């Protein structure tokens, strides 16, 4: 136990030193250099920072897996495939050659297929096949892209002639891996995987691979037509995934659609030409989304696998520390002020609305950001503000309370620390003038919410029919209980009426009541 604590402390100490040295650290290593076969890795600021976050999330997920999959027979198989999955993401992050990038990209898709297929039921089989086929389509685009690049390098083809087509292939490759519109269908279906896998996939591995690829080819993508195309695709992904998360009942799919919305947000940032700010938002999202998935997975696991949000209630029995962690991660997801989500989101919103885009796109972007609060509150309401019943058993252990404490601390403070030491991103937080428009913005949102509530009261019909009727049927289905309840009401009601009647008769016969009647009669006669 002491050795493990020492190793964990040593790893975090070395990670802190690496973060401290990151701004001035540049290193390139090649193990083999022979024509096409090149094993070359670059260690730059972005790659080291992302690998540090990936290591932190992976460590928390591996520890959480020992709790979540404790009784699984294929646990060793799961660990083996998961380590291949994480290793391929590390390799893709550091790779600087065609061979290593193709190898890492292919391993990432194959290992994700086996992880989604872990439970081996109908949902996992269909989800794994959908994931594999969509990623295979992206692999095809990537092979064609690198093939054209190799021929252009050997001067068989003109690079200027094929650069636009190659850039389009690169964009399609990133869109399939990051589940952008119209390749978004595989991401909710991949929720049939175990929750620790979902926590890793949706935070810092599979869905971020496409964005990492575009950032590596930043000079090729940053053309006027292509960044406008990236911006529009990111807007559509963000808008439709936010709308879908408001009507989805599966809680894991709600969190998955929120991930899709944030990936669209990062793609919009990349379309603005802010590749580094998009990377910073990816880092922030990886921290709090992995923690949110762990909290949701813990609640689902303690509720015996119940994922329907309509059947949850009375989760106040959860450990208070777990509730606090979930609330903090939802605050970071919304981008509330003084959270890590606000650091990147504020700067992105400022730069988006400072540009003169079409009114339609600006309105779509504003509605999509506003819907983030909608599905975050819906997720909180499903767990803690509902009135339906589901069987649950919560184990309030110290291990589960402090499992994702490191992720929560980093979600709150890491980007703020980077802001004051490395980045200098949101200088608006230093000025009082920023808070004036913020107050008016909150007032507009509040008034819009009240108007929508008054205009769309007919939407309550679904709630009254589906939720209240179901709850009433659940309470009235035990007829023996109803008989005893009515019998108890009859006996106690008869006793109550009998005692009150005897009291009235006694009071009416008394002298005091007669005196009061005489005084009232005299008063009316005088008036």
Curated annotation (Swiss-Prot):
One GO biological process this protein is involved in is:
mitochondrial electron transport, NADH to ubiquinone
Signal peptide boundaries: none
Q: What is its EC number?
A: 7.1.1.2
A Gene Ontology MF term for this entry?
Answer: NADH dehydrogenase (ubiquinone) activity
What would be one Gene Ontology cellular-component term for the protein? mitochondrial inner membrane
Q: Does the keyword Calcium apply?
A: no
Q: What does this protein do?
A: Core subunit of the mitochondrial membrane respiratory chain NADH dehydrogenase (Complex I) that is believed to belong to the minimal assembly required for catalysis. Complex I functions in the transfer of electrons from NADH to the respiratory chain. The immediate electron acceptor for the enzyme is believed to be ubiquinone.
Question: Where on the tree of life does the source sit, at the highest rank?
Answer: Eukaryota
- Impact upon substituting residue 94 to L: In strain: CB4854
Q: How would you classify this enzyme at the top EC level?
A: translocase
How does the entry describe its membrane topology? Multi-pass membrane protein
Task: State the protein's name.
Answer: NADH-ubiquinone oxidoreductase chain 5
Q: Which UniProt keywords apply?
A: Electron transport, Membrane, Mitochondrion, Mitochondrion inner membrane, NAD, Respiratory chain, Translocase, Transmembrane, Transmembrane helix, Transport, Ubiquinone
The record's comment on protein family reads: Belongs to the complex I subunit 5 family.
Q: Which reaction does it catalyse?
A: a ubiquinone + NADH + 5 H(+)(in) = a ubiquinol + NAD(+) + 4 H(+)(out)
Its annotated compartments are: Mitochondrion inner membrane
* Main location class: mitochondrion
């Amino acid at each position: 136990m002491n050795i493990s604590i020492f190793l964990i402390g040593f790893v975090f100490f070395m990670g802190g030193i690496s973060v401290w040295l990151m701004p001035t650290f540049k290193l390139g290593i090649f193990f083999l250099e022979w024509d096409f076969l090149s094993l070359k890795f670059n260690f730059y600021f972005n790659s080291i920072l992302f690998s540090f976050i990936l290591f932190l999330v992976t460590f928390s997920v591996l520890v959480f897996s020992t709790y979540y999959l404790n009784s699984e027979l294929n646990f060793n198989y799961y660990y083996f495939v998961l380590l291949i999955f994480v290793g391929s993401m590390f390799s893709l992050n550091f790779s600087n050659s065609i061979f290593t990038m193709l190898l890492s990209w292919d391993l990432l898709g194959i290992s994700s297929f086996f992880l989604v297929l872990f439970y081996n039921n109908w949902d996992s089989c269909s989800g794994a096949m959908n994931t594999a086929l969509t990623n295979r389509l992206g692999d095809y685009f990537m092979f064609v892209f690198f093939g054209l690049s190799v021929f252009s390098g050997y001067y068989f083809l003109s690079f200027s002639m094929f650069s636009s087509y190659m850039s389009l292939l690169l964009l399609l490759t990133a869109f399939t891996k990051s589940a952008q519109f119209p390749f978004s269908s595989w991401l909710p279906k991949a929720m049939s995987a175990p929750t620790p896998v979902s926590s890793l996939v949706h935070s810092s591995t599979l869905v971020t691979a496409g964005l990492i690829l575009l950032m590596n080819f930043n000079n090729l993508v940053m053309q006027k037509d292509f960044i406008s195309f990236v911006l529009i695709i990111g807007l559509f992904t963000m808008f439709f995934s936010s709308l879908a998360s408001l009507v989805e009942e599966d809680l894991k799919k709600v969190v998955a659609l929120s991930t899709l919305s944030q990936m669209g947000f990062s793609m919009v940032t990349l379309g603005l030409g802010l590749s580094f700010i998009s990377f910073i938002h990816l880092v922030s999202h990886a921290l709090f989304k992995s923690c949110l998935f762990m909290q949701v997975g813990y609640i689902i696991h303690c509720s015996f696998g119940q994922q329907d949000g309509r059947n949850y209630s009375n989760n106040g029995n959860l450990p208070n520390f777990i509730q606090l962690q979930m609330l903090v991660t939802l605050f970071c997801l919304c981008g509330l002020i003084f959270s890590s989500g606000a650091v990147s989101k504020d700067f992105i919103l400022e730069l988006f609305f400072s540009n003169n885009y079409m009114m339609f796109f600006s309105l779509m972007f504003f509605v999509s950001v506003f819907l983030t609060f909608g599905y975050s509150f819906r997720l909180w309401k499903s767990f803690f503000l509902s009135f339906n019943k589901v069987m649950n058993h919560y184990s309030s252990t110290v291990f589960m309370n402090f499992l994702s404490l490191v992720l929560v601390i980093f979600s709150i403070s890491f980007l703020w620390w980077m802001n004051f030491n490395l980045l200098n991103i949101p200088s608006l937080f230093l000025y009082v003038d920023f808070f004036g428009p913020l107050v008016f913005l909150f007032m507009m949102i509040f008034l819009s919410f009240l108007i929508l509530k008054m205009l769309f009261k007919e939407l309550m019909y679904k709630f009254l029919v589906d939720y209240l009727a179901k709850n009433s049927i659940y309470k009235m289905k035990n007829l023996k209980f109803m008989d005893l309840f009515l019998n108890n009401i009859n006996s106690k009601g008869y006793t109550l009426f009998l005692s009150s009647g005897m009291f009235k008769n006694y009071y009416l016969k008394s002298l005091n009541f007669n005196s009061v009647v005489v005084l009232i009669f005299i008063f009316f006669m005088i008036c």
